[in-house]
């Protein structure tokens, strides 16, 4: 799972910031938390690079320049960055809309679409909440929009050469969906009768996620 560590950390930071926005924490505090998250990423990256150079110098080994070798990252053309971002979004969406399945592909697709619909409904509930200031709402939508990129940053860093282990952070989307519905159920949704149907979203999401987990059991068994 080491190939997905960066994506996992970025995803967790974004999810925590979204939760802060919904919890009506001050913009100043949210910004501070965001800067701390970015600082942690930069600090961790610097420690990693220094450690890498030390290891290379001590062992005399050369970094791999094939497949997903670290040297390939410096060769990614900035002119293709927008294309890589588009591909990262496309790959993320395809993983949910057209998931890999051993036996229950159709049911798995329905489960994933249900999760996506509940998340979209939750974001709509946030947007119409009169008790949440507009700046918090804007930040929620911006953070939600960049979450797929955070989850699939490996697709950009590797120039599109991703495999299933590098998509490990995608599973955090299900955890975020449950967290989002729970937050809404205890704050916004109880004041919005038109969104009462989403109050039971936790149970529906749990069933959908159980279907996904069951498919994961079936897929490895079929492969092995």
What are these regions (language model features)?
Residues 1-166:
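Transmembrane catalytic cores of multi-pass membrane glycosyltransferases
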Residues 112-115, 183-213:
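Signature aromatic-anchored transmembrane alpha helix within multi-pass, membrane-resident enzymes
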């Amino acid at each position: 799972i080491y190939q997905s560590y960066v994506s996992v950390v970025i995803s967790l930071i974004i999810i925590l910031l979204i939760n802060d926005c919904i919890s009506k924490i001050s913009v100043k505090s949210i910004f501070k938390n965001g800067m701390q998250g970015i600082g942690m990423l930069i600090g961790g990256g610097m420690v990693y690079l220094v450690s890498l150079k030390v290891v290379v110098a001590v062992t005399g080994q050369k970094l791999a320049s094939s497949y997903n070798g670290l040297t390939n990252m410096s060769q990614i053309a900035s002119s293709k960055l927008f294309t890589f971002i588009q591909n990262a979004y496309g790959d993320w969406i395809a993983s949910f809309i057209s998931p890999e399945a051993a036996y229950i592909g159709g049911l798995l697709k329905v489960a994933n679409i249900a999760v996506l619909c509940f998340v979209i409904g939750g974001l709509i509930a946030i947007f119409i909440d009169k008790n949440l200031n507009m700046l918090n709402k804007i930040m929620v939508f911006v953070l939600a929009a960049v979450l797929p990129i955070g989850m699939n940053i490996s697709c950009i860093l590797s120039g599109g050469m991703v495999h299933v282990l590098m998509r490990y952070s995608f599973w955090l989307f299900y955890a975020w969906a449950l967290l989002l519905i729970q937050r809404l159920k205890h704050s916004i949704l109880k004041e919005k009768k038109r969104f009462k149907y989403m109050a039971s979203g936790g149970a529906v999401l749990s069933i959908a996620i159980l279907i996904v987990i069951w498919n994961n059991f079936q897929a490895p068994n079929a492969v092995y």
